[in-house]
Regions:
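Glycoside hydrolase catalytic-domain context in secreted enzymes
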Residues: 1-219
Length: 219
């Protein structure tokens, strides 16, 4: 993260807030900001080969989408996700949105809330469907399934149940592959008594506390 780059905020503003929602490229150097992905994360040395997941940034990459001429948050951009990330660069891994982009926006520009930039007029379910259609697999920070279920129903009406089921199963496959890579299905069984002894035990807590103290940087 963050696709397609996180260092181009207008006037250096923070995209967590609505006043920092725009990423700008006054010198036309958009392609330069893709290099950490296209020349590194997507071509790793060793067996990993490619990053397993990508997170689009909150920002509206202003003026980048010449195809559809839409200025919307990166996860909502068909051009940035479907055409570039999934299409041109053939990324097969998980696309997980930045945290909290589907809920309705804050009432004030300085509010620290949802970042549904460029798609404020849509319902939450419609926003979810747009992102899913673009190629998003996972919604960062979301804990309610209702909007996703509603998005699925809208998608069935719009694209057909077969197409929507295939699309949802593709995301499920991508997510499960990462879990398989962690070995969680090869040895999923636990000994409850052993777990009770080691989880949160005094020794581990002591080591954790010491590690945190050593990580502190004083300025």
């Amino acid at each position: 993260k963050h696709w397609p780059g996180g260092g181009t905020g207008e006037a250096g503003r923070d995209a967590h807030y609505a006043f920092g929602q725009f990423a700008v490229y006054p010198t036309g150097n958009f392609e330069e900001h893709l290099k950490p992905f296209t020349e590194a994360a997507f071509h790793l040395d060793g067996p990993t080969d490619c990053a397993s997941a990508v997170m689009p940034y909150y920002t509206v990459s202003y003026g980048v989408d010449k195809k559809n001429d839409k200025n919307v948050g990166n996860s909502y951009s068909e051009y940035l996700i479907k055409d570039l990330l999934r299409g041109k660069y053939e990324f097969k891994g998980i696309v997980c949105t930045d945290w909290g982009i589907t809920q309705d926006p804050e009432k004030t520009i300085e509010g620290f809330g949802s970042r549904c930039y460029g798609v404020q007029d849509m319902t939450e379910a419609e926003r979810c469907l747009l992102a899913i259609t673009n190629g998003v697999d996972q919604f960062g920070g979301n804990s309610e399934s209702g909007p996703i279920v509603e998005a699925y129903k809208i998608g069935c009406e719009k694209y057909g149940e077969k197409a929507m089921r295939e699309r949802m199963e593709l995301s499920a496959k991508r997510l499960l592959i990462n879990i398989f890579h962690c070995g969680l299905f090869e040895d999923p069984y636990l000994d409850p008594e052993e777990s009770a002894k080691i989880v949160g035990c005094e020794e581990f807590c002591r080591h954790g506390y010491e590690a945190q103290k050593k990580s502190i940087v004083l300025l």
